[in-house]
Amino acid sequence: MVAAARVVSGVKAEGLLRGACAALAAAAALLLGLSTQTETVLLVRKKGTVKDVQALWVLAMAAASAAGYHLLQLLKCLYLGRGGGRALAWTCLLLDKACAYATFATTVAAAQACVVALDGAHALQWTKLCNIYTRFCEQVAGSLVLGMLAAVGTAVLSAASARNVFRHYYCSSHSPPAPPPETCDAH
């Protein structure tokens, strides 16, 4: 009874964390994808969008993909719970790790590109862009924070998936001995 309650609470915790990661990743993708700002620079109207910096566009697509992945895993968690065999557990572990790495890598790459926009690159004669597009830069910073929180949550989920994989091996190799089969003579 206690073991069943642990499994149910573990499934609920995983579902809650998957829902939170999906919400964070979706919020990061939406905030980043919908951010634009138009400013006049030297009598020329210039519109700053996420497509101006390729790393930001990649982050928006990766965050949207991560949100979709977490929603699919949330559905799996709700309908299957911890059910499934070793193959499903390994598949979930590998996909969770790939999602964590991709989310983290794209967020860090976008943050690095944003540092150039924030400080400029004097050797290349690139000016500071955040002085011009202040609101856009603030929205991008918010999406970077949300993306990093989603990456950390995905890393925690990856650890839970690893625990689930090793639980399959531990339970099968340390299960109590099976009772002897009953025969007709025993009755």
UniProtKB/Swiss-Prot annotation:
The keyword Iron does not apply. Its main location: membrane. It is found in: Cell membrane. InterPro entries: CASP/CASPL, CASP_dom. The keyword Ribonucleoprotein does not apply. Residues 36-54, 119-139 are extracellular. It is a multi-pass membrane protein. It comes from the Eukaryota. GO terms for cellular component: plasma membrane. Residues 1-14, 76-97, 161-187 are cytoplasmic. Homodimer and heterodimers. PANTHER family: CASP-LIKE PROTEIN 2C1-RELATED, CASP-LIKE PROTEIN 4A4. This is CASP-like protein 2C1. It comes from Zea mays (Maize).
